[in-house]
Amino acid sequence: PFDKDRDGFVLGEGAGCVILEEYEHAVKRGATIYAELKGAGLSADAYHMTAPHPEGLGAYLVMKNCLEDAGVQPNEVDHINMHGTSTPLGDIAESSAIAKLFGEHAYNIQINSTKSMTGHLLGAAGVIESIAALGTIIHGVVPPTINHFTDDEQIDSRLNFTFNEAVQRDVKVAMSNTFGFGGHNACVLF
C-alpha cells in the first residue's frame, strides 16, 4: 500500500474474533480488559461498484461518524490502521480523507496498513485489522506497512506512515477502517 508502483491487492486467508463484554460485567468477574470499544461508524457512498469517490467522501464520513459515536475529538487519535488495499485509487482517497478530517493532527497520527503483511482477507479483513489496532494499545508497537519503496506524489507525504519497520508508540486511542465493494464503509475506535 501507498507505494507509487502499487497495482492492487493480494488475497490472503484468515479469521478472527473479538469478544465484547459489558464493562461492569467484566469488572465484576475479574476479567482482563485489553481495551474498550469507544465507538463505531458506518457509511455508504455508493459512488462506484469497485472504486471509491475520488475525494474519499465515504472514508471521510465513516471516520467522522465513528468519532462522533465515540465522543472523541480528532486530536485524541494516536493510530489508524487504514483499509489500505494497495489500489491506486483507494489509497489516495483514504489518505485524502484522513488529511481532511484530522487537519494538522493527521501528521501526528501513526498510520499503517496491515494488509501489506496479511493480504486482503475479504470478510475477515475488518476483524483482523481491528485486532491489530488493539495490539497497538496493548503492546505499544505499531506494525509496519511493508514493501514500501517509492513515495506516491499523490499521497500527502506529511502523513506519518509506518513504512517497513515497526514503531514503538504509546497508543491510547486507535482507529481501524474497513471498506467494501459498492461503497460500504465501517470504522471502529478503541
Q: Predicted segment positions?
A:
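Conserved catalytic cysteine-centered active-site region
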Residues: 1-11, 95-127
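Stable alpha-helical structural segments in soluble proteins, enriched in small hydrophobic residues
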Residues: 62-70, 97, 101, 133, ...
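Conserved active-site and cofactor/substrate-binding residues in soluble primary-metabolism enzymes
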Residues: 10, 14, 18, 32, ...
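Condensing-enzyme catalytic core mediating Claisen C-C bond formation in acyl metabolism
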Residues: 1-70, 78-79
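Beta-strand segments within the central parallel beta-sheet cores of soluble alpha/beta enzyme folds
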Residues: 32-40, 75-82, 109-116, 144-152
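Histidine-centered active-site/metal-ligand motif
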Residues: 25, 48, 83, 120, ...
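Short glycine/threonine-rich loop-to-helix capping motif typified by GTGT followed
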Residues: 47-56, 85-102, 121-128, 160
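Conserved beta-strand-centric core segments of catalytic alpha/beta enzyme folds
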Residues: 1-25, 125-190
